């Protein structure tokens, strides 16, 4: 029950924030907003404000939308004259671009605010990139890494924290990573191929959670630093960028077949994680919201027709060429985008069901 409640609350918060971004910028540019909906299907409750916007909560809590006047004229009442002053498609390319981009960007803004709050309040704890132990029969042992070795670079990128090492290896995925090691004041380079392992968290019933490892354990020491507002904001932005890079890398590896689509989670997976984060307390839940918000913002920026990113591409095409995309071409691309989204939804739900009964 906690998972169901957590899922509804979490999705409602993220969808509201996302759609509110579209709403605010549309209103700023004097574009008429007709509806603001949390959920799909039959309206459970609704109210119409003085500006004529119908605010409602619908039966199926799997998303939401803002109905913007003039967004798609093919769906408008042909018997009524269009009010060009408040129509979306009568605005400039820049104004339309900002309206469409506002949803994903406000998701990023929410995540940055939450992360910044945590950094300012709790500070930052860094674990030096020094190896404390090497796992037997691991890639690290085969590469002759030893306790006390300091990792200076990963794939030519300097690392200052053990988390940096983990991130760079994960971003590189199943490809070999190049580590610059400092041992007794001497530096040398090793190439190491991570191995895929299956982990079974104690609280989980299924055992099909996959991750990558090279088999090193950090030395048991840490450095805690207090961070001011500007420092917290900077760290929050970097954290958001790192999370986006990891997600994009995972997507690209799935496309080329280096990672399995089994890793895609659907509503049941989100519901389970929502329940666990709520049970873990306010701090854990806020971090969960921030991480989901990053992913929601990023996924909506992907150049897939029907998503915000796809519409941004159409607007950019118009801005560069001075011409609207051909209606037939646009419709074909929108249908293709819908097929891609439906395909991903089927995979996500299928994975959820499989994990539920595994």
Curated annotation (Swiss-Prot):
GO molecular function: metal ion binding; metalloendopeptidase activity
Cofactor(s) needed: Zn(2+)
Keyword DNA-binding: no
Residues where Zn(2+) binds: 18, 22
GO cellular component, one term: plasma membrane
Annotated localization: Cell inner membrane
TM ranges: 52-71, 97-119, 285-307, 332-351
EC number: 3.4.24.-
Superkingdom of the organism of origin: Bacteria
SUPFAM superfamilies attached to this UniProt entry: PDZ domain-like
Swiss-Prot/TrEMBL keywords: Cell inner membrane, Cell membrane, Hydrolase, Membrane, Metal-binding, Metalloprotease, Protease, Transmembrane, Transmembrane helix, Zinc
UniProt-listed GO biological process terms: proteolysis
Domain (PDZ): residue spans on this chain: 102-186
Enzyme class: hydrolase
Pfam families assigned to the protein according to its UniProt record, in alphabetical order: PDZ_6, Peptidase_M50
Active-site residue numbers: 19
Topology versus the membrane: Multi-pass membrane protein
Residues annotated as signal peptide: none
The family this protein is said to belong to: Belongs to the peptidase M50B family.
Database matches in PANTHER family: MEMBRANE METALLOPROTEASE ARASP2, CHLOROPLASTIC-RELATED, REGULATOR OF SIGMA-E PROTEASE RSEP
Protein name per its UniProtKB record: Putative zinc metalloprotease RC0203
Organism of derivation: Rickettsia conorii (strain ATCC VR-613 / Malish 7)
Phylogenetic classification of the source organism: Bacteria, Pseudomonadati, Pseudomonadota, Alphaproteobacteria, Rickettsiales
